[in-house]
Design a protein with these regions (language model features):
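Bacterial lipoprotein signal-peptidase II cleavage site
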Residues: 21-34
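Extracytoplasmic small-molecule ligand-binding "clamshell" domains
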Residues: 32, 44-128, 136
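Hydrophobic/proline-rich hinge and linker segments of small-molecule sensing/allosteric domains
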Residues: 51-59, 140-162
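Flexible hinge/capping segments at coil-to-helix
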Residues: 71-72, 154-172
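Short helix-initiation/N-cap motifs at beta->coil->alpha
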Residues: 86-88, 103-114, 160, 195-209
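Alpha-to-beta junction loops
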Residues: 99-101, 117-126, 171-172, 208-221
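A ligand-binding cleft/hinge motif common to bilobed small-molecule-binding domains
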Residues: 110-111, 127-137, 184-187, 208-225
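Ligand-binding "clamshell"
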Residues: 120, 132-147, 190-192, 225
């Protein structure tokens, strides 16, 4: 992929695990593996399960695979899909400590908190940053991970040799909806802050299409491209 990563200085952000009590309800049918993630999930029905919500689209934190391995976990609501990544391994450790079966549920980012509050999942492990607004509706654990945000541009971009975020003044910059990847853009003076998109793959696609000059992405995810 003809991308270049520049500037790992936007923001050092703590990535936290959200934990709340389990709920009850009905179960939804499985999705096709190629279908987009739904914003709802099967409700928690068995206390023997530890149900974790994530996007399964955010490597290396969490992503989706099509074949079982010794380390990935089946995605309950996507037929033939398996979740892998750092967040999945954290979830496995927690499930083992709790003595419960780990169940991974694929959800869109903006559906995670609602699913947690409705009792459809027991936890969000998806690189969600602790904010005052989110604390109004969910609880957070201690940090399990730290990350640094970066700017990603295409190779050959006029911004390729930028050394400061202020070098992106006048640039059209894109972030992910409902995340700090979008919120931090306003730190850049004179920036053209584009309407955010729903996922990191969507941001990458927009960058490749040339509809933005740069995207905000954390360093570890940028290294996957």
């Amino acid at each position: 992929m003809n991308l270049r990563r520049t500037i790992a200085t936007l923001l050092a952000a703590l990535m936290l695990l959200a934990l709340t009590a389990c709920g009850a309800g009905t179960t939804s049918p499985a999705q096709d593996a190629n279908a987009p993630a739904e914003e709802t999930a099967p409700s928690t029905t068995e206390s023997s399960q530890f149900r974790v919500g994530m996007e399964c689209a955010y490597a290396p934190s969490n992503w989706q695979e099509s074949a079982a391995t010794d380390t990935n976990v089946p995605v309950e609501n996507v037929t033939g899909a398996y979740a892998e990544g750092y967040d999945v391994q954290i979830a496995r450790i927690l499930a083992d400590q709790l003595g419960k079966e780990l169940v991974i549920v694929k959800l869109s980012w903006d559906g995670l908190i609602d699913a947690l509050n409705q009792g459809q999942i027991d936890a969000i492990i998806a690189g969600m940053m602790d904010t005052a607004e989110r604390r109004e509706s969910i609880n957070f654990s201690d940090p399990y991970k730290e990350t640094i945000y970066s700017m990603m541009v295409l190779a050959g971009s006029p911004y390729e040799n930028a050394t400061s975020i202020q070098d992106f003044s006048g640039a059209a910059v894109l972030g992910q909806q409902g995340t700090a990847l979008d919120e931090v853009i306003d730190q850049i003076e004179g920036v053209e802050h584009l309407s955010p998109v729903g996922s990191v793959p969507d941001m990458i696609s927009r960058l490749q299409q040339g509809t933005c000059d740069a995207i905000v992405i954390n360093v570890e995810n940028a290294q996957g491209y």
